[in-house]
Amino acid sequence: MIKDERWEGVYSFEDSPYLMETLTDLRKISTENISFRKGLVRLGRYMGYELTKTMEFEKMPIQTPLEKTEGIFSKDRKNVVIITILRAAFPLMEGLIKNFESAKVGIVSASRGHAPDFKIEMNYIKVPQLNSEDTVIISDPMIATGSTLIRVLNEFKDSKPKRMLIVGVLAAPEGINAVKAEFPDVEIFVTKIDEKLNKDGYIVPGLGDAGDRAFGEPYKVSMLPQMHNLE
């Protein structure tokens, strides 16, 4: 894990050959949906493991079958809330949660419009109650313009959790700048920080639309405007 000196609290995993090889597979246009999903799970699992190293641990006495000794315990690891942004982040969350078995999970449906305004639409939020002991991890594969994450962070800023983290696959400097400008205390962990955004707001060289590549290109449902909350 490498701390990026351009920002406070921004880290990448460019020093991991395993993750760089996985990212290489994700970037390839020839990678099929199932392989793409599995790659996101692998990245989430590895990055989740690395996140545990940033948490507070305390010593505790334990009894083995032979004698008393000392172990460690992390209260932080037991107070994790993973917020997943539909739909691309599901495989990433699947990997993350393997390191945080007790984690609560929140779901946010948010989508970004096209250039030039990149308007964010958020039409579904279901997130557990948050408190000052929680470590909140927002999983979103791509930090492009940062507008989606800023909208999501604004929804939960008043809950004042212990830590707010963003975990992603790729980020553009423009997106990190935007998020940090509004939420300087938010920590960002990504596999790699790419070069820039193109005129359409996509990360380049990037890996394309993570949601489409993980689950397939969406069907254009003509009845969608008439659909209501299914709960």
From Swiss-Prot:
Pathway: Pyrimidine metabolism; UMP biosynthesis via salvage pathway; UMP from uracil: step 1/1
SUPFAM superfamilies, A to Z: PRTase-like
CDD domains named among the record's database cross-references: PRTases_typeI
Binding site residues for GTP: 38-42
One example GO MF annotation: magnesium ion binding
NCBIfam families associated with the record: PRK00129.1, upp
Notes on activation and inhibition: Allosterically activated by GTP.
Pfam family of the protein (one): UPRTase
Cofactor note: Binds 1 Mg(2+) ion per subunit. The magnesium is bound as Mg-PRPP.
Biological process terms in GO annotation: UMP salvage; uracil salvage
Name of protein: Uracil phosphoribosyltransferase
Family: Belongs to the UPRTase family.
UniProt keyword terms in alphabetical order: Allosteric enzyme, Glycosyltransferase, GTP-binding, Magnesium, Nucleotide-binding, Transferase
Cofactors required: Mg(2+)
Keyword Nucleotide-binding part of the UniProt annotation: yes
Residues given in the record as 5-phospho-alpha-D-ribose 1-diphosphate binding sites: 87, 112, 140-148, 209
E.C. number: 2.4.2.9
HAMAP family the record matches: Upp_A (MF_01218_A)
Reactions accelerated catalytically: UMP + diphosphate = 5-phospho-alpha-D-ribose 1-diphosphate + uracil
